Amino acid sequence: MSKVIETKQQVVTEIADKLRA
């Protein structure tokens, strides 16, 4: 479960970074 949350957080961070750029 912890890994799933970590992966989701990573994806969210990636999307946020793309939106900023």
Swiss-Prot record:
Miscellaneous information on this protein: Under acid-stress, this protein is expressed at a higher level in wild-type B.cereus than in the acid-sensitive mutant strain NB1.
Protein name: Large ribosomal subunit protein uL10
GO annotations of cellular component type: ribonucleoprotein complex; ribosome
General function of this protein: Forms part of the ribosomal stalk, playing a central role in the interaction of the ribosome with GTP-bound translation factors.
GO molecular function annotation: rRNA binding
UniProt record similarity statement: Belongs to the universal ribosomal protein uL10 family.
Oligomer status and interactors: Part of the ribosomal stalk of the 50S ribosomal subunit. The N-terminus interacts with L11 and the large rRNA to form the base of the stalk. The C-terminus forms an elongated spine to which L12 dimers bind in a sequential fashion forming a multimeric L10(L12)X complex.
Keywords of the record: Ribonucleoprotein, Ribosomal protein, RNA-binding, rRNA-binding
